[in-house]
From Swiss-Prot:
GO terms for cellular component: chromatin; cytosol; nuclear body; nucleoplasm; nucleus. Gene3D superfamilies: Transcription Factor, Ets-1, Winged helix-like DNA-binding domain superfamily/Winged helix DNA-binding domain. Changing residue 343 to C: In BDPLT21; loss of function in positive regulation of DNA-templated transcription. Pfam families: Ets, SAM_PNT. It is linked to Ewing sarcoma: A highly malignant, metastatic, primitive small round cell tumor of bone and soft tissue that affects children and adolescents. It belongs to the Ewing sarcoma family of tumors, a group of morphologically heterogeneous neoplasms that share the same cytogenetic features. They are considered neural tumors derived from cells of the neural crest. Ewing sarcoma represents the less differentiated form of the tumors. This is Friend leukemia integration 1 transcription factor. Belongs to the ETS family. It comes from Homo sapiens. SMART domains: ETS, SAM_PNT. Residues 112-198 form the PNT domain. Residues 281-361 bind DNA.
Length: 452
């Protein structure tokens, strides 16, 4: 037993790291001390495993992954799915990338990158829209799909000299000629996903750009026009400048906006006002009658929706008015003189600066059509007062003027005072006889009734 232990110790004693305390202490020193070439406490420097380079290689994929997510959030035009072969080989396989990775292709094509250029920046950028791919993009996508989904039995020569447009035109049968059914479904699904993502991104971006352009053009347009007008007043030399884009945008929007039909808006009102009822039709009502029907636009038509109209054929309008009134000698001169009568009535006005153009005042027409009281009715109310005829009638019947007036019988001498002082007229003795019947609606005040 003791011989076995001694033999084991003799074998292990060759490794001084198990017994030498100085060696163990040196193992716990910082990395900077472990790389010092002059330290005599632990063996030769070439026996130490170079840990710092390995640590840098481990941290590199993490840095690439974070930068990749940041680029995708900022609307990168790369494919929505990360097609980096070098990333997949390092993260999944954990080893060095094979000769078909994108980094080797980029190094061969453009030479070594700058020292401050990261792995993510060295990646080849593939357009998000597969229809824009070149032959090289198709080759890169195919290599990425083979390694990403572990696809086998794919004839890569079938996709040589094929760009993105030809690739998108391929159907399921075309893919089956180059690979198996499983690989065909995988490739078609990923290709369809890329196309849908690119269309959605394009529509969203175009809508956002269009709305931003509209908001930028609509808001400053008035301000730009106002500044241009102010500048023209201050400096006449600015008149030579080209027209502003904002003003052109406003004019185009105004022209493109559909104008309302005046016959639909003013038609019902014209028909209602043109109906004279049982009386004779007037000239302004006759014009409204013509304007209520768009078939008469050859001789008279509306000019907008504010009541303005124009006689396109004034002689025809005068002729029709003469037929209606049985006046064959009617012409436009007589018609225009008749229209002047309505200026003071606030029924219509003449539009200045335009020939044969007039404008109806519908508010004035509504006031003109309201019934006004006549002069006889204004003086009917005083004659209808009830106490006037009854007063004169009762004066004859009751005999308000007796031959010998007497004093008013009151209970208090301070209420009216002396009768002769208050009633100075001979009618001071009102109702001297208490047996006289009282008549309603007389001029006697109500507060005197309690004394009789």
């Amino acid at each position: 037993m003791d011989g076995t232990i001694k033999e084991a110790l003799s074998v292990v004693s060759d490794d001084q790291s198990l017994f030498d305390s100085a060696y163990g202490a040196a193992a716990h020193l910082p990395k900077a001390d472990m790389t010092a070439s002059g330290s005599p406490d632990y063996g030769q420097p070439h026996k130490i495993n170079p840990l710092p380079p390995q640590q840098e290689w481990i941290n590199q994929p993490v840095r690439v992954n974070v930068k990749r997510e940041y680029d995708h959030m900022n609307g990168s035009r790369e494919s929505p799915v990360d097609c980096s072969v070098s990333k997949c080989s390092k993260l999944v396989g954990g080893g060095e990338s094979n000769p078909m990775n994108y980094n080797s292709y980029m190094d061969e094509k453009n030479g070594p990158p700058p020292p401050n250029m990261t792995t993510n920046e060295r990646r080849v950028i593939v357009p998000a829209d597969p229809t824009l791919w070149t032959q090289e993009h198709v080759r890169q996508w195919l290599e990425w799909a083979i390694k990403e989904y572990s696809l086998m039995e794919i004839d890569t020569s079938f996709f040589q000299n094929m760009d993105g447009k030809e690739l998108c035109k391929m159907n399921k049968e075309d893919f089956l000629r180059a690979t198996t059914l499983y690989n065909t479904e995988v490739l078609l699904s990923h290709l369809s996903y890329l196309r849908e993502s690119s269309l959605l991104a394009y529509n969203t971006t175009s809508h956002t750009d269009q709305s931003s352009r509209l908001s930028v053009k609509e808001d400053p347009s008035y301000d730009s026009v106002r500044r241009g007008a102010w500048g023209n007043n201050m400096n006449s030399g600015l008149n030579k400048s080209p027209p502003l884009g904002g003003a052109q945008t406003i004019s185009k929007n105004t022209e493109q906006r559909p104008q309302p039909d005046p016959y639909q808006i003013l038609g019902p009102t014209s028909s209602r006002l043109a109906n004279p009822g049982s009386g004779q039709i007037q000239l302004w009502q006759f014009l409204l009658e013509l304007l209520s029907d768009s078939a008469n636009a050859s001789c008279i038509t509306w000019e907008g929706t504010n009541g303005e109209f124009k006689m396109t054929d004034p002689d025809e309008v005068a002729r029709r008015w003469g037929e209606r009134k049985s006046k064959p000698n009617m012409n436009y001169d007589k018609l225009s003189r008749a229209l002047r009568y309505y200026y003071d009535k606030n029924i219509m006005t003449k539009v200045h600066g335009k020939r044969y153009a007039y404008k109806f005042d519908f508010h004035g027409i509504a006031q003109a059509l309201q019934p006004h009281p006549t002069e006889s009715s204004m003086y009917k109310y005083p004659s209808d007062i009830s106490y006037m005829p009854s007063y004169h009638a009762h004066q004859q019947k009751v005999n308000f003027v007796p031959p010998h007036p007497s004093s008013m019988p009151v209970t208090s001498s301070s209420f009216f005072g002396a009768a002769s002082q208050y009633w100075t007229s001979p009618t001071g003795g009102i109702y001297p006889n208490p047996n006289v019947p009282r008549h309603p609606n007389t001029h006697v005040p109500s507060h005197l009734g309690s004394y009789y």
